[in-house]
Regions:
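AMP-binding/adenylate-forming catalytic core of the ANL superfamily
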Residues: 178, 289-403, 422
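Conserved active-site and cofactor/substrate-binding residues in soluble primary-metabolism enzymes
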Residues: 85, 105, 109, 183, ...
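Conserved AMP-binding/adenylate-forming
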Residues: 206, 215-310
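Active-site phosphate/ATP/adenylate-binding loop shared across adenylate-forming ligases
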Residues: 4-6, 60-232, 240, 244-250, ...
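Flexible loop/turn segments at secondary-structure boundaries
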Residues: 138, 216, 241, 291-293, ...
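Nucleotide 5′-phosphate-binding alpha/beta core
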Residues: 1-89, 94-112, 116-120, 124, ...
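Conserved strand-to-helix beginnings and helix N-cap segments that scaffold or border functional pockets
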Residues: 141-142, 182, 220-221, 264, ...
Length: 434
């Protein structure tokens, strides 16, 4: 099933023609309406008319988050304030926020993109969509809401938190699509079981569209088992559009990028050169339909890759892999680059361990120390010292084998690690001077 079949199944040649037309229009548009881009193009000695093929996008300069902060509040807007119908901003705690404006057309495009993936998840206008992302300046809640309303669904705008009420509504109203973060979906599953529910039998939810944080395959399976549904990973970021830039279909084999709205590149974050399809690198997006806050070659810092080939679902848009991490949340442990998602992939292989974990960084003098705290499942015999020691040793062995670095493992009892109703805090940095 498709929401916009003609667009979602375009021939590659037709899509390339559409992208080129929109890219050429975009470069002229930002040159004429955003002084930052006029100055940036002039400095790079590139003019809008120099863009003759899609490959010419590599001639255009990158845009980074600091550029948006420096432009606070309105300098990256391409339209007058009278045409801005909504503003979203990043949740950063240092410096100026990164602000993104939306026109009516921008919001319609956003709604259409998200609606495509509700349909891909098996939803329809008959669906009851429970939105448990946060509402506000964060794009998650309103993005999912926008997509559900575009499709004609019934929306329950729960926002995040109030988990008991969340579970009650999910049960009583028979919600069939859940939208939230992976860690919160896991928390809902655990809490529902604690309240005496058997989610696979007691709930009508058939799919969860989860985003805003990485979700390993192991964590996906745990959520699916606890809630009795299918998990689809959705991708977005506030600077580009919020959730709906890309999402999995029911094949769960890569996230389809809405390529009629975005051009995606994967680059080596060190050399800034493109990498071949299938190779991991940093995702870079160009927004080719946005009116208020268009972006040229925006460096996301998100690590992914292009999944080669065409998906069996019939959608022809290229796919990216699930986000492995960010270049700025990468840990360097004794010279080895490690992403939290790599650790998650290892620990979720153990039946005795849940997907809840926290990485604690401490320091003594010039030496950094890394401790991984993981929780056991409720029925693990925590008081049997030999079993506990054996499991600790086995997890440490697997981590070293996969990461090529030793990590101290601390196994804690169930419900020890704080739960999050939004994005999970996976790294606790207690190092001196941090």
């Amino acid at each position: 099933m498709y929401y916009q079949q003609e667009l979602e199944t375009m021939l590659e040649s037709d899509l390339s023609d559409l992208q080129l037309t929109r890219l050429r229009e975009l470069t002229q548009y930002v040159y004429d309406n955003i002084p930052f881009y006029r100055k940036s193009f002039d400095k790079a000695q590139i003019a809008p008319e120099d863009i003759k093929t899609l490959a010419d996008i590599k001639k255009l300069p990158f845009t980074v988050k600091q550029d948006l902060r420096d432009a606070y509040p309105f300098k990256m807007f391409a339209v007058p304030n009278s045409q801005v119908v909504r503003i979203h901003a990043s949740s950063g705690t240092t410096g100026n926020a990164t602000v993104v404006g939306y026109t009516e057309k921008d919001l319609k495009s956003w709604g259409d993109c998200f609606a495509r993936f509700i349909v891909a998840a098996g939803g329809s206008k008959e669906s009851i969509v429970q939105v448990a992302y946060g509402y506000g300046l964060f794009t998650g809640g309103l993005g999912a809401h926008q997509g559900a309303e575009a499709l004609g669904c019934t929306v329950i705008p729960m926002s995040s938190g109030n988990t008991k009420r969340q579970i009650q509504f999910m049960h009583d109203f028979k919600s069939d699509i859940l939208c939230c973060t992976p860690s919160y979906a896991l928390h809902i599953g655990e809490s529902a079981a604690d309240d005496g529910y058997n989610p696979p039998q007691d709930f009508a939810v058939s799919a969860a569209i989860l985003g805003a944080e990485p979700c390993s395959e192991g964590m996906r399976k745990e959520i699916e088992e606890k809630l009795g549904l299918r998990v689809l990973d959705i991708y977005g970021l506030s600077e580009v559009m919020g959730p709906g830039v890309a999402c999995e279909c029911d094949r769960q084999n890569g996230l389809h990028v809405c390529e009629d709205h975005f051009i995606v590149e994967i680059i080596d974050p060190e050399t800034l050169l493109p990498v071949p399809d299938g190779q991991w690198g940093e995702a870079v997006f160009t927004t080719i339909t946005k009116e208020c806050s268009p972006l040229i070659r925006y460096r996301t810092r998100d690590i992914t890759r292009i999944v080669p080939g065409i998906c069996e679902c019939g959608r022809t848009f290229r796919r990216i892999d699930r986000i492995a991490g960010r270049t700025d949340d990468m840990l360097i442990i004794r010279g080895v680059n490690v992403f939290p998602s790599q650790i998650e992939e290892v620990i979720t292989q153990f039946e005795e361990i849940t997907a809840q974990y926290q990485i604690v960084l401490t320091s003594k003098g010039s030496l950094d120390h890394v401790e991984l705290q993981v929780e056991t499942v409720p029925d693990f015999p925590f008081d049997e010292v030999r079993k506990l020691e054996a499991l600790t040793k086995e997890i440490g062995k697997e981590l070293k084998g996969n990461l090529q670095v030793a990590v101290t493992v601390k196994i804690v009892e169930p419900k020890t690690i704080a739960r999050s109703e939004g994005k999970a805090k996976r790294i606790l940095d207690l190092r001196e001077g941090r």
